[in-house]
């Protein structure tokens, strides 16, 4: 990693700079290389065209130019940390990278003006996704959660409210032989267990090693003998859904169009997760909630408060109600908005997928904001191994508790 000088500008200075940003814009148009008038922006892959109008509006209002580049969100942290001083001023990222970027000093708490707007305009879960250790570090512009897809010719809307009804009347498919922890691990939330504590930020706060956790493993193991359960793999989800072998499965918005093609637009139903019976208790199945963010990297500005203030202003434009509505309507984007006003618009209310995701993301009854800690890398591999081995019969039932207690210890010791 190249050495760079860390310059952090406080909120008061930024607000002063922001207030004179437009007025001073024309005077600074002949600025030197130490006071550049161009902001580098990284947007998600395939999103550049959809942001052109809002970026043009920002340029007109601020007298700053924006150099917009498409970049892969999952690699945001890696690319920014490589050399923050030459990276983007404003960049998109998934919220689970937030903690590592804050801990490494790459991004700072956003000015209070914007954090107040976020808390007022965005859903509570989305605002939580933009926070770390009680402070707001980024701007939400969308939410993402898995939902239940089902074939309406095989199951009714009432049927899919209960996992037991689904599997008694038809079939449910999931990847249990090779578990996807993102999809399956939230079952532990359903029985009251926590991952990295109640707020997801306590590295030693995982408590799967208890009777509730054991009941989850017993349930997973029991699905091998459930006639209504079909094990899937990465390559056959849509083919099984299309040929009728599977009447329902859980996935995210990214599979919506493929699911429509598999069973036909008129046959595809979308719903929130069902309730599920674990150890004789009817509980709500839960999912991870992902939040899409824009963050500001102050390093390229080299202490130029006007440019930093302009960068925060650009992030605010990109995540505004107007921009979120456009991101939802644009074909190929279809980002589910986190802004409460946009969520209540007729366009969003009349969209079945959007309504299911919004209900999933409406409260902790359905979703838990995915933790942002470094230790998540250990979590993914170790939890997937335990869950897969349980389904495949590689762990004795008598060893479930010990395995889970060791898992808790391993996560607590991870860095």
Regions found by a protein language model. Give the residues of each.
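Conserved N-terminal structural module of periplasmic/extracytoplasmic solute-binding proteins
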Residues: 3-13, 17-97, 277, 375, ...
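Ligand-binding "clamshell"
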Residues: 103-109, 133-135, 259-283, 351-352
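C-terminal capping/gating helix-and-loop segments adjacent to ligand/active sites or protein-protein/ligand interfaces
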Residues: 131, 337-340, 354-410
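Extracytoplasmic/periplasmic substrate-recognition and gating elements
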Residues: 262-333
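Hinge/lid segment of periplasmic solute-binding proteins
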Residues: 95-147, 158, 270-271
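Extracytoplasmic/periplasmic solute-binding protein
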Residues: 137-141, 146, 164-214, 246
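Glycine-centered hinge/linker elements that transmit conformational signals in sensory
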Residues: 202-233
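Short helix-initiation/N-cap motifs at beta->coil->alpha
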Residues: 70-79, 96, 230-243, 254
